[in-house]
């Protein structure tokens, strides 16, 4: 690969402009891969696409050549036309010599619509002439060609093609305007016509020509252009930027248009852009690259966890089912004792005064009894040894039990007798 790059760089440094395109490389086994390769038996394996000049578009003034399986854009060898053919051709008055590129002939063609105006300032005794190629030059005035008419200010004497003399508006350059423009034609013309000055400076209406041919011969790198006023000039040629066509590259190649040429590259996910919500994939089982839709992001609404578990979304979008212990249902409120007129529903937990002890029944179980609440729903007390079990049974010395069938009542005679003696 490095040797081939040095050859291309060397060709450019020596003046030969070659735009090469390398479609292969050396693999790890030392074989050359050019969308096909030499196998170990020495045979050519052409499994890849055939690369020829039909799929490569070269810039202007370049043509495609295939050398050693590589396509190259080589500069055209421009053959200059035989301009000397018109040197020995003398055309009659009103005609000039033109070189026909297609027929390779020097032809005498008439001026269309009139000979160009010569604006070159010539020394005394010389006049400006236009040769057969439209080039302005100063030639010595002959004695019989002297225009001796006295013309008014702003006009000058001119000799017509028939030899007659007349005074026409002067277009002679001035010192402050060495290249003055011709006077503006102000004549109103009918549709399809335009105002022009003839060779004598007279205004007239001529029919518009939509397909004027620009026949000026320009130097290399320049081309003929027709201005808005109908005049012709040579301007620098701007190379057109090549464009990719359906057959510019092989089937599995991607066409990239640069400033002066097109390049065929193998598409990869690095140089492939996919639309939104799509991503690029490539591999051995895929022909080239492919854009496939992105996977839908999972949410906890789409996850079903087992019992006593709930879905939690962690950092990075990771979903997990974590244990969620069930909450113990709230105990039934104590009902009012039928033998006591005090309200037992008006109880509270006073953490500040009793340090987290259960303070129900307007101050029951305070610090004097050193009662505590443990995990087994047990109220331990040294003196009274009262406990609260899960069967909603209140066990103490009086064997008070809760009878749900009698309508939320305390049915115990001993408790009723001792209820008034309880120190709240």
Swiss-Prot record:
Q: Where is this region: Disordered?
A: 330-424
Q: What's a single GO CC term here?
A: plasma membrane
Q: Which GO terms describe its biological process?
A: aggregation involved in sorocarp development; spore wall assembly; sporulation resulting in formation of a cellular spore
Q: What SMART domains does UniProt report for this protein, alphabetically?
A: FOLN
Q: Name one GO molecular function term.
A: DNA binding
Asked whether the UniProt record includes tRNA-binding among its keywords, one would answer no
Entry keywords, A to Z: Repeat, Signal, Sporulation
Question: What are the Follistatin-like domain coordinates in residue numbering?
Answer: 52-74, 85-109, 117-139, 184-206, 215-234, 299-322
Taxonomically, the superkingdom here is Eukaryota
> Which InterPro entries does UniProt cross-reference here?
Fol_N
Comp. bias intervals (Acidic residues): 335-357, 365-424
- Which positions carry the signal peptide feature in this UniProt record? 1-23
Q: This protein is called what?
A: Spore coat protein SP60
| UniProt source species | Dictyostelium discoideum (Social amoeba)
**Gene that encodes the chain:** cotC
């Amino acid at each position: 690969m490095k040797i081939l790059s040095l050859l291309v760089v060397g060709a450019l440094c020596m003046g030969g402009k070659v735009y090469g395109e390398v479609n292969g490389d050396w693999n790890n086994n030392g074989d050359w891969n050019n969308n096909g390769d030499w196998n170990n038996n020495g045979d050519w394996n052409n499994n890849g696409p055939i690369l020829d000049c039909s799929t490569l578009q070269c810039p202007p003034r370049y043509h495609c050549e295939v050398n050693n399986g590589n396509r190259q854009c080589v500069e055209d060898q421009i053959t200059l036309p035989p301009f000397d053919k018109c040197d020995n051709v003398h055309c009659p008055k009103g005609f000039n010599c033109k070189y026909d590129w297609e027929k390779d002939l020097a032809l005498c063609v008439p001026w269309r619509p009139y000979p160009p105006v010569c604006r070159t300032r010539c020394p005394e005794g010389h006049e400006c002439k236009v040769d057969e190629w439209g080039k302005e030059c100063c030639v010595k005035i002959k004695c019989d060609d002297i225009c001796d008419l006295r013309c008014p200010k702003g006009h000058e004497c001119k000799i017509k093609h028939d030899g007659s003399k007349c005074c026409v508006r002067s277009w002679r350059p001035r010192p402050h305007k060495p290249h003055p423009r011709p006077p503006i034609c102000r004549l109103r013309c009918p549709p399809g016509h335009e105002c022009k000055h003839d060779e004598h400076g007279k205004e007239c209406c001529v029919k518009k020509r939509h397909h004027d041919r620009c026949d000026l011969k320009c130097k290399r790198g320049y081309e003929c252009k027709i201005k808005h006023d109908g005049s012709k000039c040579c301007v620098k040629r701007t190379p057109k930027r090549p464009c990719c066509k359906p057959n510019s590259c092989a089937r599995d190649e991607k066409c990239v248009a640069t400033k002066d040429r097109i390049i065929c590259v193998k598409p990869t996910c690095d140089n492939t852009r996919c639309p939104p919500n799509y991503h690029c994939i490539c591999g051995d089982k895929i022909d080239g690259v492919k854009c496939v839709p992105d996977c839908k992001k999972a949410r906890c609404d789409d996850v079903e966890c087992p019992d006593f578990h709930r879905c939690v979304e962690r950092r990075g979008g990771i979903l997990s089912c974590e244990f969620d212990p069930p909450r113990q249902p709230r105990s039934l409120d104590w009902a009012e004792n039928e033998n006591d007129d005090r309200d037992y529903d008006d109880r509270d937990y006073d953490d500040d005064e009793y340090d987290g002890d259960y303070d129900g029944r307007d101050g029951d179980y305070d610090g004097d009894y050193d009662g505590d609440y443990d995990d087994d729903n047990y109220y331990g007390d040294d003196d009274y040894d009262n406990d609260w079990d899960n069967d909603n049974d209140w066990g103490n010395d009086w064997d008070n039990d809760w009878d749900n069938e009698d309508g939320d009542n305390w049915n115990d005679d001993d408790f009723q007798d001792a209820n008034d003696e309880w120190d709240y």
